[in-house]
Structures are given as structure tokens and as C-alpha cells.
């Protein structure tokens, strides 16, 4: 028979192992996103479990977000890891987009009030665990509060832009 404290120690060890296992499995699943079997509308592309569409008619950030919300579960695109960033980069480059910037769902609704750029978030409320700034928006002299992909970085890195500028945009939505 085990002493009463042994059960709580063993329970704690088991819980710790299970938590560690789930974290490790989660990391592997991000690296190998299975190709989704979803049907996306004409003019959009599937990646993971979402559809992505680039719209070339320029809109302000807010109007682009509203346009994306007309699609099921739609918002301006959130870029959650480097694999998704690479997918978006090649998608935007393939279209022959002539603009220097393209809207994504990144914005700072606090207008810089949070220290160290802490106010930036995705329009669909996805958690920001991946960062890929072309320049640090909290230290720039000409700070702006809406996010875009930058042509100078091959559409891989993010740049803060004035929200009222009209740019092409990428929507991410369910198929």
C-alpha cells in the first residue's frame, strides 16, 4: 500500500507528463499541416483548413476587413507561423500585384497606447505568437496602426501603415 502523499506525487507527475506530451505533439502538428480537403470558391486557394483570397481592388483597412467579413468566418488574414507566411508570400507574388503593400488583419486598436507595441492584435482575435515585423512599429517615427505585407520583403514581413490608405487585401475564411 502506498502512503497517501505518494498518490498526489504520482498524480502530479502523470499530469506533468501529459501536459508535456500535448505540447510536443502540438509543435509537430504545426510543422506538418495536412493538406485540407476543403472546397474553396473560384479565385481563392486552400491552405490548412482555410480559404485565402487576394482582392486587387484597393480598400482602406477597415473597408477591407468589412469586405472579408462577408465571407463565412472571414476576416483579413492572420499570419500565425512562417509556413503560412511563405504560402501568402507566394500567393501574392503570383498575382502580379503592383502595390508596395497588401493589407493583412493586423491592427493596433489602442493607437499605440500600449507600451512596446503591446496593442497589436489580429482582427479575428487569433493569438499573436508569431511576429515578423519589417521594422518595429513602436519605435518608428511615422507610426501607423494597421498592418500590411511589404513588397520589399517579398511579402513575407509586416509593415505598419496608415489605416486610411487604399491597398489590395487578403481574406482568410472557412470553405
UniProtKB/Swiss-Prot annotation:
Keywords: Acute phase, Antimicrobial, Disulfide bond, Inflammatory response, Lectin, Metal-binding, Secreted, Signal, Zinc
Signal peptide interval: 1-26
PROSITE patterns: C_TYPE_LECTIN_1 (PS00615), C_TYPE_LECTIN_2 (PS50041)
PTM section of the record: Proteolytic processing by trypsin removes an inhibitory N-terminal propeptide and is essential for peptidoglycan binding and antibacterial activity.
GO biological process, one term: defense response to Gram-negative bacterium
Keyword Transport: no
CC terms in the record's Gene Ontology section: collagen-containing extracellular matrix; extracellular region
Propeptide: 27-37
Keyword Membrane: no
SUPFAM superfamilies, per the entry: C-type lectin-like
Induction (record text): Up-regulated in the intestine by S.typhimurium infection (at protein level). Appears in pancreatic juice after induction of pancreatic inflammation.
C-type lectin domain location: 47-172
Short sequence motif named EPN, residue ranges: 114-116
Cystine bridges: 40-51, 68-171, 146-163
Observed effect of gene inactivation: Mice are more susceptible to salmonellosis, but not listeriosis.
Pfam families to which the protein is assigned, alphabetical: Lectin_C
Primary location: secreted
Cellular localization per UniProt: Secreted
PANTHER family for the chain: MANNOSE, PHOSPHOLIPASE, LECTIN RECEPTOR RELATED
Function of the molecule: Bactericidal C-type lectin which acts against several intestinal Gram-positive and Gram-negative bacteria. Lacks antibacterial activity against S.typhimurium. May play a role in protection against infection with S.enteritidis by inhibiting its translocation from the gut lumen into intestinal tissues and further extraintestinal tissues. Acts as a hormone in response to different stimuli. Secreted by different cell types to activate its receptor EXTL3 and induce cell specific signaling pathways. In pancreas, is able stimulate cell proliferation.
Stated name of the protein: Regenerating islet-derived protein 3-beta
Organism the protein comes from: Mus musculus (Mouse)
Taxonomic classification: Eukaryota, Metazoa, Chordata, Craniata, Vertebrata
Gene encoding the protein: Reg3b
Amino acid at each position: 500500500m502506498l502512503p497517501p502523499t505518494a498518490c498526489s506525487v504520482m498524480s502530479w507527475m502523470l499530469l506533468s507528463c501529459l501536459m508535456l506530451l500535448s505540447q510536443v505533439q502540438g509543435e509537430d502538428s504545426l510543422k506538418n499541416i495536412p493538406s485540407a480537403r476543403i472546397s474553396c470558391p473560384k479565385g481563392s486557394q486552400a491552405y490548412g483548413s482555410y480559404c485565402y483570397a487576394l482582392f486587387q481592388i484597393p480598400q482602406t483597412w477597415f473597408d477591407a476587413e468589412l469586405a472579408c467579413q462577408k465571407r463565412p468566418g472571414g476576416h483579413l488574414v492572420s499570419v500565425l507561423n512562417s509556413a503560412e507566411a511563405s504560402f501568402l508570400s507566394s500567393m501574392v507574388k503570383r498575382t502580379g500585384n503592383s502595390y508596395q503593400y497588401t493589407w493583412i488583419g493586423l491592427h493596433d486598436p489602442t493607437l499605440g497606447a500600449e507600451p512596446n507595441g503591446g496593442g497589436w492584435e489580429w482582427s479575428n482575435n487569433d493569438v499573436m505568437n508569431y511576429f515578423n515585423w519589417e521594422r518595429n512599429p513602436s519605435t518608428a517615427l511615422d507610426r501607423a496602426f494597421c498592418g500590411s505585407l511589404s513588397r520589399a520583403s517579398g511579402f513575407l514581413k509586416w509593415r505598419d501603415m496608415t489605416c486610411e490608405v487604399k491597398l489590395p487585401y487578403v481574406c482568410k475564411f472557412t470553405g
